[in-house]
Amino acid sequence: MTHAILIKSFPKDFGWLSYCLKSIHKFAKGFSEVVVIIPEGSDLPLTAERLIKISEPGNSATSVTNHGTGYTYQQIVKMNADKYTACDYVVHLDSDCILTRPVTPDDLMVDGKPLWLMTPFKDILSTDKNLGAHVESMRHFSGIDPEFEYMRRHSQMIPRWAYQCFRNYVFERHNLSFESWALAQKFRGVTEFNFLGQFLHREFPNFIHFHDTTYGIPDSYVMQSWSWDGITPEIRDKMEKILA
């Protein structure tokens, strides 16, 4: 089995991305490739990663403008990850995340299945005002009241076959590609890994190890920041110490 680490980034996050890549070089072992997807016209210093440059929709896509340029499109790219790597499994990692200790593909699996954390909405809705939007968008997307939130932390390993199955489901339900459906949604109308997690939990529960965090949270190997806040001196110092 082969495993790719996939990062969708853009120029504003390249400062974060440099730390993310340094952490991968330091701590990631046993992965076949690292794929960094960036917009056409942007550039990065030469690295060991395979860079893929893609065109992104412009201001004609109203929902993209409302989200900030490219926000919805990066969600679309992630749900098409199988088009950017031939590996059997894809590990999604955001630019503003760094690995904090050695990690291998086996660390992301339980009994040979990708580990996927989920938390009952009833336990967390009162703690985060944004989660209500996730419930509404998941209900609108699937027609089913969601029981769990599936975007608990980075990173997330997903089998290659799951992306095409998911896109087929979207077309069967909405008669639209995932891209067309997503770009037509309002602000916070797309929560891609919640959509995919809910779908896989319902249709393929025996192929993913879904873990209810009510029964404990496995140790994390990722430090996740909030890129919109910028790299503060405190965060920079913390990342530098981890990567020293």
Regions inferred by a protein language model and the residue ranges of each:
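Catalytic core and acceptor-binding pocket of nucleotide-sugar-dependent glycosyltransferases
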Residues: G143-S227
